[in-house]
Swiss-Prot record:
Cysteines joined through disulfide linkages: none
Subunit structure: Homotrimer.
Record: residues binding substrate: 107, 144
GO CC list: cytoplasm
Gene3D superfamilies referenced in this protein's UniProt entry, alphabetically: Hexapeptide repeat proteins, Tetrahydrodipicolinate-N-succinyltransferase, N-terminal domain
Keywords of this entry: Acyltransferase, Amino-acid biosynthesis, Cytoplasm, Diaminopimelate biosynthesis, Lysine biosynthesis, Repeat, Transferase
Gene Ontology molecular functions: 2,3,4,5-tetrahydropyridine-2,6-dicarboxylate N-succinyltransferase activity; nucleotidyltransferase activity
Pathway noted in the entry: Amino-acid biosynthesis; L-lysine biosynthesis via DAP pathway; LL-2,6-diaminopimelate from (S)-tetrahydrodipicolinate (succinylase route): step 1/3
GO biological process, one term: lysine biosynthetic process via diaminopimelate
The protein's name: 2,3,4,5-tetrahydropyridine-2,6-dicarboxylate N-succinyltransferase
UniProt-annotated location(s): Cytoplasm
Gene: dapD
Amino acid sequence: MPNAPLRTAIEALWERRATLSARTEGEDRDVVEKVLSALDAGTLRVAEPFADGWTVHEWLKKAVLLSFRLNDSRVMERGCGGEPAFDKVPLKFDGWDQFRFAEAGFRAVPGAIVRRSAFIAPNVVLMPSFVNVGARVDSGTMIDTWATVGSCAQIGKNCHISGGAGIGGVLEPLQAAPVIIEDDCFIGARSEVAEGVIVEKGSVLSMGVFLGASTKIVDRATGEIFMGRVPAYSVVVPGTLPPKEPGMPSLACAVIVKRVDERTRSKTSINDLLRD
């Protein structure tokens, strides 16, 4: 089924979502399953880059949400550490054997949890981490220990999502756009990127940077303030904005301490960039 009819079917299901349940069978269930399988395989994605920026496919988010209406929770015997779990969403690796993992081409360390409909590209390394429904992790990226990739988040190629970092999702609270981490980015330990923020290509976030849609991102060199996106090749650290009136509290912000171009980045390690 081409994408246009698939989209039309999902939009129609969304309008009558209250009628769906775990007892729903036939074409209604099949169309949602087709979308989830395509997301899982990476042939569809919730957000796509084009020449004029990113396009979010809302209908794919709707399909993910509809899947929760169509399934009851069940005991899952292959949870973290082999412990049983009880959930509506099966794990991506259910039933996988040596051949299936080798075919997929990525590594998943014990303790890595990926829910079905998330796409993991070849040459990804998953440390004990969590990747939620509808997310996409592209090739050459490492998701480090205790990092989380939220629902429908998009992680680019050759990124490093450091230990304990959080990449926000879109399903709860419902957000218009997923978090997007473009290619060649480094997200420092215990940082959080949420509420549809876009971290553009080649950027470096130091440890403990918190970014939401309303976070002010201040360019130290120019004074320019960005919100909702980190410009390409920025090096960002936590900071504070002074109060407008004496005696009032300062407000947290993020600070672009410098920019690097691709030539500089190719010759300079990430650690050196953060220690300037």
